[in-house]
Amino acid sequence: MAIYAVVGTQWGDEGKGKIIDFLSSKIDYVVRFNGGNNAGHTIVVNDKKFIFNLLPSGVLQGAKCILGPSVVIDPLILIQELEVLKNNNIKTEIFISDKAHIIMPYHIKFDELSEQKKGIHKIGTTKKGIGPCYADKINRIGIRTIDLLNTEIFANKLKTNLEEKNQIIEKIYNDKPLDYDDILNTYKKYIEILKSLITNTEKILHHAINSEKHILIEGAQGTMLDIEHGTFPFVTSSNTLITAAAGCGIPISKIKQKIGIIKAFSSRVGSGPFVTEISNSIGDIIREKGQEYGSTTKRPRRIGWLDLLTIKKAIALNELNHLALTKLDILNNIESLKICTAYEFQGKIYDYIPTSCETIEKVRPIYKVFKGFKEDISNIKNYDDLPIEAREYIEFIEKEVGIQISILSVGSEREKTIFRNQEWSNI
């Protein structure tokens, strides 16, 4: 039995989808433990691009897929993704936790209206209803997938919630109320499609562990968007750390292989402090070469140099023992590359990320500068064949964080991957 966990070390969009995809080739179960359709992961197989927002990345390898209790589910999006699998003749088993919460139309409405009302102070959410859905969960008024299996229970909870939500929509936001019958009838159609997938996933995972099955746990977003440890309030609404995987029913002590995904540069979607942000044309070049646009929102991502403070924080919080570096190929033909090693503010050197966003906004990055490499590295298969400049960049990261980068991605396709030890190439 082997249980792997994969998490992002930055602000999401690190390239987790590709890494998870090939790790899933010999995995029995892939489990998503957090977030909703605000996360997007892109996988390229045989020159065909797949983008999923809810289904785990391992779905293309035939692993059984579980959406855990802490995932919030938009039924329409999930149905659309299931249709993609069907249309591409991809056969797999999908299990939805009966404890997972359901995104309702009023959650999406609240998300949109709240962002509008905040104006220049908006968080920059995806407006998918994720935050309002988690808020209802915390307030203990959310609708769970188990409620969908009993029409009377679902209808009563919807009625109670909608009466309260419509009061807020009308009186606080001066907008039109939502219609109860429209929502009920629409969701009844969703229920017919999804009800056979809703089950006790905790029981399935316990059986899998006892049967010594191989399990891969997949996190959405990244460490710096964690609700507790990220750049609050410019964060997501869920816990993104490996510790949150316990919510799936898998004891943390069982997870031996913890893999952190690092993008060779930094990116961020939406508002919030971004110390290493590149404000000149180099940022634009990296964005275009790397196609750095949100999988979910299509918004252009903000681009920055690699920030080692975020990587060190992610390693410490997640107890990572393996690293994968992605999109190294995007950095070719750039004269100088930079890595941030510390921050400075008012004469004080920070080797950690301050808690206050107001402080983070004011710090100055301290950089180590590297000579760039010109070669196209996207077809290189062996580490020693990489340009010396690329290897110096990689080895500096390893020296600073104390963990070997075992996997290098030099292109979006599965085969454009360099393994630095036999353990990963044989999985």
Curated annotation (Swiss-Prot):
Record bears the keyword GTP-binding: yes
Binding-site positions, IMP: 13-16, 38-41, 126, 140, 221, 236, 299
InterPro entries noted in UniProt: Adenylosuccin_syn_GTP-bd, Adenylosuccin_syn_Lys_AS, Adenylosuccinate_synth_dom1, Adenylosuccinate_synth_dom2, Adenylosuccinate_synth_dom3, Adenylosuccinate_synthetase, P-loop_NTPase
Sites where the protein binds substrate: 295-301
Residues annotated to bind Mg(2+): 13, 40
Task performed by this protein: Plays an important role in the de novo pathway of purine nucleotide biosynthesis. Catalyzes the first committed step in the biosynthesis of AMP from IMP.
EC number: 6.3.4.4
Record's keyword terms, sorted: Cytoplasm, GTP-binding, Ligase, Magnesium, Metal-binding, Nucleotide-binding, Purine biosynthesis
Assembly and interaction partners: Homodimer.
Short name of any one Pfam family annotated for the protein: Adenylsucc_synt
Localization: Cytoplasm
Name of the molecule in the record: Adenylosuccinate synthetase
GO biological process: 'de novo' AMP biosynthetic process; IMP metabolic process
HAMAP family xref list: Adenylosucc_synth
Active-site residues from the entry: 13 (proton acceptor), 41 (proton donor)
SMART domains: Adenylsucc_synt (SM00788)
Transmembrane portions of the chain: none
Binding site for GTP: 12-18, 40-42, 301, 327-329, 409-411
Entry GO terms, CC: cytoplasm
Organism: Borrelia duttonii (strain Ly)
